[in-house]
Amino acid sequence: MVESVSIYEKYFKDPKREPVLIDYVRTPIGKRRGTVVRHRGDDLVIHCYETLLNRNDFDKSVLGDSIVSCNSQIGECALDIGRNAAMGAHLPVSVPGFSVNRHCASGAQAVLSGWQAIACGAMDAVICGGIELQNKYPIMADAYVFNEELGKPLMVAPNKKILTNPEVAAKLKEFNTTLSGQINSAHVLGIHYYSKHKGISMNEFKGEYRDEFKQELDQISLLSHQKACSTYDDRAKEIEPIWCPKLDENGKPMLDENNNVAQDESLSVLTTQDEGPRPTTSIEALSKLKTIIGRKSQAFLTAGNSCPTSDGAAAQIWMTRGLAEDLGLNPRATILNFAIVGTDPVLMLDGPVRAMPEALKRANLSFDDMAFIEINEAFSSVVWSCCKELGIDWNDPRFNPWGGAIALGHPTGMTGCRLIGTNLHQLEKAGKEYAISSMCVGFGMSIATIVKNENPK
C-alpha cells in the first residue's frame, strides 16, 4: 500500500489549519427552454448559499470570503457576483466577495481559491461556488461590444500578439487551423488523437476511419445518458430543488405580487432533478443528427455527442479543521492534492492528459487508487482523446458513473464545483477514499483535483 502525499501536509505543518469541506449543494441543471434559466443567476447562487447556511448552524461572521465563479460575467452575473450573492443571502456585510473566471474550470478554481486562502492562513472559512446561465448568456457573451457603425454587437477578437507567440504560431501551422473557439478545437483534437492512435495521417482521416470514430463518440454519448438516467436518486442527494416560475401566454415568467418567484404550484413548478438526460435516446437517434463542424467527409461532432447549453449553480463551505471542531461541524472531505496546468491552446481541450497525471504524481498515487474518475464531457471527442492518452476505459464503472456533461449539461462556471462535490457524494455512498476530477479549459488549460473522503468505510 503506497503512502499518499497531502499537498497541505507537505507544505504546511499545523493539522488544525488544514482546509476541510463541510458541505456542498447544487441546483438541478437546466436544459435549453427549461425551467432553471427563468431565474436570475445571482438568485441561483443565493439559493445554494441559503441552503448551506440553513443546514449548518454556526456564526456566519467567521466566513472570510465569498468566492463565485462565472464564465460569462454579464447581466446579473456581473457586478462582482461573489459579493452580491453574499449580501443577497443575508450574510454579514463584513463578509467580502469576489468573482473568478478560468473558463470551464472556473468552478474548480473558486473552490481552490478558497482552499488556498485557508491553507495559507489568510482566513479560517469561506463559502464558494459557481454559476452559469448559458441559455440566457451564451459562452463568450461577455466578449461582445456594441458597434455603433454597424448598429449591432460584435465580438472582440483575441489580441493579435497571441498569434505571434512562437508556440502558438507553430501549433497553428502544424494543425493548419485557426484560433477560433472550442468547437473548432474539439474537431481538430478528435482528428489528431484518432489519427495518432490509428497510425494514420490527419489527411487520411475520412471514410471508414471517420465512420468508426463517430460511432465510438455516439456510444460515449449514449453511455452518458444511460448512466445519468439510472442514477437520479444518487444525484438527488446533492441537489436542492428549486421553485421556478411558469411562463404566461406571452412567454414571460409568472411572479407573485411582489415580483418574486412564488412557492406555489399555480405560478411555479418545483424543479427537483437535472433536465438534460434523455431516457429514450439511442445509437440510431444519435447517428441521424447533423454534424456541426468540418468538411462532410471528416465531420463527426453533433449536438448529440457534445454537451448541451445548460444552466445551474453550486456552492460549498470550507474551513479549517480546528474551526470545524470548535463549531461542532463534521468535515466530509479534504483536497488531497491538485494540479493547475497550461497546455496547447490550439488543440486546447486535452488539458486533463497533463493535469491528471501531475496531480496523481504529487499525491504519490495512480488511477488504480481512484475509486472514481471524472473527466468533464465537454465534447465526446475530448473524452475519447483523454481516455486513450491516459489509458482509461470509458466503459470502466469508475468512470463518470453518474453520467457526464453530455447528458447533464456543462454550466461552465458551475461544473468544476459540481465535479468536486459529486466526487464527495460518490465516495460517501461507496465508502471509498479517493476520487479525481478534471476538465478541459478554453485556450488550453486544465485543473485536476483529488478528493479524499474523511469517513471511508
State the predicted function of each range.
Residues S4-Y11, R17-V20, R26-T27, V37-H47, ...:
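N-terminal extracellular/periplasmic Venus flytrap/periplasmic-binding protein-like
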Residues Y8-Y11, R26-E50, N54, S72-G75, ...:
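Active-site pocket-shaping loop/turn-to-helix segments
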Residues K13, G130-E132, Y137-I139, I183-V188, ...:
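Conserved N-terminal phosphate-binding loop of PLP-dependent enzymes in the Aspartate aminotransferase
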Residues R38-V126, G130-M155, I239-T271, V346, ...:
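Conserved beta-ketoacyl condensing-enzyme motif
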Residues E50-G64, H192-G199, K206, R210, ...:
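Phosphate/pyrophosphate-binding loops at sites that engage ATP/ADP/AMP, CoA/4′-phosphopantetheine
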Residues C70-A125, T177-N184, K198-I200, T280-P308, ...:
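Conserved catalytic cysteine-centered active-site region
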Residues A125-E208:
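Flexible glycine-/small-residue-enriched beta->alpha junction loops
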